[in-house]
């Protein structure tokens, strides 16, 4: 691919030379633009003058990719910051926003799940695939959802954490708005919803869970053992027994963790495997000598960027994006450039809760070198997988011109391999439902279809319906169950598209959204005043129509079933003593009204009780003796 902008003219070069002559020596961020005014590179510097001038003073000695970039620089702008840490953070934000062509792109696998502890008086703990800056604590990401579910099960078996979604404000609890559920009666929750557990006691439990998730099992076991001994001395044997059960569960968990170091310290291990234009970085999270997790990030558009620079980009990205405890030691595959190392030191220092120096080591022999080698092997493995997937995506694009066409039409950053489409259905404002169908590689994936019975509003309100459906898919329990799509498609026009986009923004999700309006088959995207009109023969339009029609079919089918069920229930609820719940029980047990009508009194009694059973029997057998 070549730059569409022409090379800078003499006037531009003269203006650029003047800017180079007046550059400050402060730390900050610089932006290079081409003749069209497009930002093509963003960088940070400890000394802006020295760093920016180095691009122009060393022409002829630069790597190929850098030399090409410099030939297209027509303008530059700098932002002075008060520290290298500020420059590092600003650079990261600008690269995300501007997506400059010559910057290395770092992409985490956003479909990986995290464990979240919510920022509430009585926090909830669950799996999510979305990291939001909402004050909640996030742990992960976990490469396997099954691994995370095991941890959630462990936490649930040891700690009585609430599973409800109630908003337990002081006012709500004091007013007696909520009642304890089954979890309270089977000792899996202590009933904070009814004020049976104090906020202080609950938060103390959350601190223990955080200690566990940070890999500090030894410290937690010591604290719990001391507490157990204390309760036993106070003759509080029931509480001591509960603590003993917690301790035994923790010991079983600790035994399953892989010991990778004889030193019981905290360290993060980093390595990068590089290919021709792609790379992969892996970090091992080691706590108390045990490997508690790993994470990998893909780096693309790397060109011939030196390995130390790639490693620095990966490490900086990790600590900027991951809300995690800073360890005592960082083990690196290679020495970082001095300027990058100093910026990283300052960043880690600013994020530490304890005042201590983080050690940087580049081991060559022994146990630590073995850890680096193991980390690098994993990076090579993930890079190989990435290259295979990249090749496969290319083959999919060749075999499915519709996906490639759709990518071009909607200006998507990647091939829309996974598309989710929403459609609403109702009858005169009743039985409002929404459907979501999923296409993967241009074909339906019915196991990922979902349907929603909408309840958050009354009457006919298509915008409220779309808001509820999109919120429940991307903000509810499904957010952790299904991977995020490459494109969200709405069966509707500009208004519904904007509603869906607003919901995603509120949830902190940057997902492409488009809508297909029925009448003229126009394509709407958020914040665009005019729709796109594609030829009727367009492969992209045909794919969108197929998605829209399938979502409509799925919604209509579900809506008809609900209406049918309601009609059937109405016949049963017309019988004296049969309410909505009894009708649902009867239908669930017998399968149909006809089967209910043929049942004996004894059979009906097993489901609805003797008195109601006699009433039902008389209704269907009028004139017959029971």
From Swiss-Prot:
Residues 218-253 form the UVR domain. Residues 25-104 form the GIY-YIG domain. The keyword Cytoplasm applies. Signal peptide: none annotated. InterPro entries: GIY-YIG_endonuc (IPR000305), GIY-YIG_endonuc_sf (IPR035901), GIY-YIG_UvrC_Cho (IPR047296), Hlx-hairpin-Hlx_DNA-bd_motif (IPR003583), RuvA_2-like (IPR010994), UVR_dom (IPR001943), UVR_dom_sf (IPR036876), UvrABC_protein_C (IPR050066). Keywords: Cytoplasm, DNA damage, DNA excision, DNA repair, Excision nuclease, SOS response. The UvrABC repair system catalyzes the recognition and processing of DNA lesions. UvrC both incises the 5' and 3' sides of the lesion. The N-terminal half is responsible for the 3' incision and the C-terminal half is responsible for the 5' incision. Belongs to the UvrC family. This is UvrABC system protein C. The gene is uvrC.
């Amino acid at each position: 691919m070549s730059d569409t902008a022409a090379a800078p003219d003499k006037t531009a070069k003269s203006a650029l030379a003047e800017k180079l002559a007046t550059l400050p020596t402060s730390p900050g961020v610089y932006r290079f633009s081409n003749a069209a005014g497009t930002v093509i590179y963003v960088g940070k510097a400890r000394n802006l003058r020295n760093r920016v001038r180095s691009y122009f003073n060393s022409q002829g000695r630069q790597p190929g990719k850098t030399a090409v970039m410099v030939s297209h620089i027509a303008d530059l702008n700098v932002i002075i910051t008060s520290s290298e840490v500020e420059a590092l953070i600003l650079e990261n934000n600008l690269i995300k926003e501007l997506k400059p062509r010559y910057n290395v792109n770092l992409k985490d696998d956003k479909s990986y799940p995290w464990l979240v502890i919510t920022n509430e008086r009585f926090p909830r703990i669950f799996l999510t695939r979305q990291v939001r800056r909402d004050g909640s604590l996030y742990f992960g990401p976990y490469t396997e959802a099954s691994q995370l579910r095991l941890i959630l099960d462990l936490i649930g078996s040891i700690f009585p954490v609430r599973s409800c979604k109630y908003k337990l404000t002081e006012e709500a609890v004091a007013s007696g708005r909520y009642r304890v559920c089954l979890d309270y009666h089977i000792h899996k929750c202590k009933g904070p919803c009814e004020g049976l557990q104090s906020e202080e006691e609950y938060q103390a439990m959350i601190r223990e869970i955080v200690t566990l998730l940070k890999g500090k099992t030894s410290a937690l076991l010591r604290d719990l053992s001391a507490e157990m001994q204390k309760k036993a001395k106070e003759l509080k044997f029931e509480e001591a027994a509960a603590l003993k059960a917690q301790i035994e569960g923790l010991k079983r968990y600790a035994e399953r963790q892989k010991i990778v170091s004889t030193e019981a310290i905290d360290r993060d291990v980093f390595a990068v495997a590089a290919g021709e234009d792609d790379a992969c970085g892996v970090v091992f999270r080691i706590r108390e000598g045990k490997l508690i997790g790993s994470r990998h990030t893909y780096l693309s558009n790397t060109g011939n960027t030196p390995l130390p620079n790639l490693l620095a980009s990966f490490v900086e990205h990790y600590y900027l994006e991951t809300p995690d405890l800073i360890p005592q030691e960082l083990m690196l595959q290679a020495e970082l450039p001095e300027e990058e190392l100093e910026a990283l030191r300052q960043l880690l220092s600013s994020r530490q809760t304890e005042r201590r120096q983080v050690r940087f080591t580049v081991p060559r022999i022994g146990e630590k070198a073995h850890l680096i080698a193991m980390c690098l092997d994993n990076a090579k493995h993930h890079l190989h997988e990435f290259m295979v997937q990249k090749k496969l995506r290319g083959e999919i694009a060749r075999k499915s011109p519709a996906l490639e066409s759709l990518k071009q039409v909607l200006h998507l950053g990647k091939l829309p391999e996974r598309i989710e489409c929403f459609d609403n259905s109702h009858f005169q404002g009743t039985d409002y439902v929404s459907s979501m169908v999923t296409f993967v590689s241009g074909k339906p994936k019915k196991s990922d279809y979902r349907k929603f019975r909408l309840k958050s509003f009354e009457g006919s309100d298509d915008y409220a319906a779309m808001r509820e459906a999109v919120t429940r898919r991307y903000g509810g329990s499904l957010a952790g169950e299904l991977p995020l799509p490459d494109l969200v498609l709405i069966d509707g026009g500009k208004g519904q598209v904007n509603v869906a986009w607003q919901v995603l923004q509120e949830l902190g999700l940057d997902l492409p959204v488009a809508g297909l309006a029925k009448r003229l088959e126009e394509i709407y995207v958020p914040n665009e005043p005019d729709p796109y009109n594609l030829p009727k023969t367009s492969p992209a339009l045909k794919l969108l129509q197929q998605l829209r029609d399938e979502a409509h079919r799925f919604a209509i089918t579900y809506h008809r079933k609900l209406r049918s069920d309601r009609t059937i229930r109405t016949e049963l609820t017309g019988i004296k003593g049969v309410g909505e719940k009894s009708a649902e029980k009867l239908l669930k047990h017998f399968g149909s009204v006809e089967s209910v009508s043929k049942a004996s009194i004894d059979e009906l009694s097993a489901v609805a009780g003797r008195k109601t059973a006699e009433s039902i029997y008389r209704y269907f057998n009028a004139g017959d003796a029971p």
